[in-house]
Amino acid sequence: MRVGIDLLEIARITRIAAHSGGRRIVFSTAELAYADTLGAVRCTEYLAGRFCAKEATAKALGRGLGQGLTWREIEVLADAHGAPQVLLSGGARTVAEQAGIGRIDLSLSHQGGLVVCVAVALPREAPAPASPCEAPAPASPCTDPHGTSPGRTAGAPS
């Protein structure tokens, strides 16, 4: 497992969000198509989140952007439930495959003019997360894994 994190002031993305040339270098057609459906403030927040997610993903891949990865090769779109999802292509996909990475999970949050993203790169053979409803029941506080009973020390006479 590899982890990448990035923190960004949303205001730093304002120039990129307003400049069509910069937008096309950093963001995919699908990312921009969705951003263009939003109002100006929300568009900037959305693009800042995607920028931050791309940075965190590159860190989780163990590379900086420009070191075998380009911005548009890391695409961040929403799944059916609105959660951010990473799609890799080109050099980014090659780097992930060579590192044995099967998927990258993201967590994004916006607060007070900042956006933070954590990217967790999981090995190809990593199972899907178990439902919290299916987690094994915790051991009873009265059950001792060493075969002793509460109030009795291992090896002490009964």
What are these regions (language model features)?
Residues M1-S158:
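Core catalytic alpha/beta fold that binds nucleotide/phospho-ligands
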